[in-house]
Amino acid sequence: MSVYDLLIGQDHIVETLTAAVNAAASGEESQEMTHAWIFTGPPGSGRSSAAIAFAQALVCKQKGCGTCNECITAKSGAHPDIEILKSEGLSIKIDEIRELLTRTAWAPSMGGWRVVVMEDADRLTESAANALL
């Protein structure tokens, strides 16, 4: 079992994400994790599923085993170091981003990473996007 099991037919994506998790876990300065990843594609292509699986793998001590406490907690949506931001209306407003930035400044609770998956980032208002930058 793996956190990537739901990414059927996306072997090249799984390889890329697995390599990134392994590189980040190596601790080598030349392999540091980038501050952001963008998952693009048409609706139904698995963007959110891939991003969430990647987040789960980052917080897992076994790099995405799918069976440990971190993976189970992340899969249930209750992991304190993974936050999924979805637009509640037609747009993501600056107040939501300001609250998010406050929370993301905290150190990770259970692992080495604090991960935010932002669904529908194209719905950010201009001021919200600027605050995020």
PLM features per residue range, with description:
Residues 1-127:
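P-loop/Walker A NTP-binding region and its immediately flanking N-terminal helices
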